[in-house]
Amino acid sequence: MGRMHNPGKGMAKSAIPYRRSVPSWQKMTAEEVQDQIVKMAKKGLRPSQIGVILRDSHGVGQVRRLAGNKIFRILKSKGMAPELPEDLYHLVKKAVAIRKHLERSRKDIDSKYRLILVESRIHRLARYYKTKRQLPPTWKYESGTAASLVS
């Protein structure tokens, strides 16, 4: 898939194992994985961070194979899902950081341009999530209140 505001093609990807069964060396059960996910979510970790910790520290390659559901769906069933989707959250966080930088250095023209690009990505992604009903139809990105969304 190509990049939105870049000429790069983005060809790097990881290969998912063909076998869909749980590996024989896997020691954790589905309940233990779900407990770990809930425990890490209570600490304030995002779903991708939870997946990285489970992969690196506990040897769980794919939560979906072991637990039957993805991390986000497990959190959603427990009522602990984040209110903003993760990719939108990180774009808003980046826009807040650029805006904070622009307060200190107003003449940075390149950062102004990058802020426009990031905010256009935010608007496009918000429109997508509104059609998928993961965001309420009244949700709107406003630069003044964006810092409260990511704090």
From Swiss-Prot:
Tree of life domain: Eukaryota
PROSITE patterns the UniProt entry points to: RIBOSOMAL_S15
Molecular-function annotations in GO: small ribosomal subunit rRNA binding; structural constituent of ribosome
Localization: Cytoplasm; Nucleus, Nucleolus
CDD domains: Ribosomal_S15p_S13e (cd00353)
UniProt-listed Pfam families: Ribosomal_S13_N, Ribosomal_S15
One Gene Ontology cellular component: nucleolus
Subunit structure: Component of the small ribosomal subunit. Part of the small subunit (SSU) processome, composed of more than 70 proteins and the RNA chaperone small nucleolar RNA (snoRNA) U3.
Family: Belongs to the universal ribosomal protein uS15 family.
Name used for this protein in its record: Small ribosomal subunit protein uS15
Organism: Caenorhabditis elegans
